[in-house]
């Protein structure tokens, strides 16, 4: 049981640390709290006066929670582009829980079942490697930082490590120049609001190189102007 307690607790701390570096930290932050809560529940279970529970319960729990996190995380990673942490870490939990359950049946399984279990376990590991590569190695997409930058403007958070300027400056994308155009436009408007003509012109010049203001959706600039109270 202590193995599972340490696993859930360690993953909770690790995910929380990663969440602080994300454009939308609350998504993976909530997942970290769920895992920490589970580790506390398992710890309380070890101190219960009466035992006799299912020793495989933590493995089932890891499989269910991890599998659910993978589904949710893949949507956030590939569809809405909001988070890249939940899916790979959920996959780790799912792999550990599932492989533990498969290994428990290994000795009593026939050859066909053993081959099937091995293929299934190998497939899970390969998929997990992809999730780690896509989420933790490739990392956050530029569009995610651009979206979070707009949110920070709406909150009035402009400066600092978690301000709108910092988020937009992390949103550069070598493949999608339209994202760069949106970010340069946003930064130009922010510096216009602050009467920083030098910085504003730097981003206007960069914006002109990739199509100018015409390359930016009017709805984007109008929304930013509204939040910045620019006429």
Regions found by a protein language model. Name each.
Residues 156-159, 195:
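Residue-level detector of the short coil/turn that links helix A to helix B
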Residues 162-165, 172, 201, 208:
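Tetratricopeptide repeat
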